[in-house]
Amino acid sequence: MGNKFRGGMPGMGNMGNMMKQMQKMQRQMEETQKRLEETEVTATSGGGAIEVVANGKKEIVSIKIDEDLVKDGDVEMLQDMVMVAVNDAIKKVLDMSESELGKITGGINIPGF
């Protein structure tokens, strides 16, 4: 009876391929994350009277408020509309990130990305 395993442990070639695939996936995720960080999304409320722009790092880049809203003097309504637009912008960023990174991971949630 000869040695069936010739040159090492069975399955180790597959392990090497898996490691290469994981490294490739990590590179793709890092590239995608960098691209996402540079992407901006816009959300509005009040029929476009409030506009919020956020980037892929979940940072608010700008907020524009129609002057007529300020003239009305309804601060509470203005605050609510800003909050709605900010929350919508953040949700858009999260959805965009989840969608793009999900294409790489096949839907597996990987912490830190």
UniProtKB/Swiss-Prot annotation:
Chain segments carrying region Disordered: 1-44
One cellular component (GO) term of this entry: bacterial nucleoid
Q: Where found in the cell?
A: Cytoplasm, Nucleoid
Q: Which UniProt keywords apply?
A: Cytoplasm, DNA-binding
Q: What is the first-listed, main subcellular location in coarse terms?
A: cytoplasm
Locate the compositionally biased regions of type Low complexity. 15-26
Description of how the protein assembles with itself and partners: Homodimer.
For this protein, the record's HAMAP family field holds:
DNA_YbaB_EbfC (MF_00274)
Q: What is this protein called?
A: Nucleoid-associated protein FMG_0513
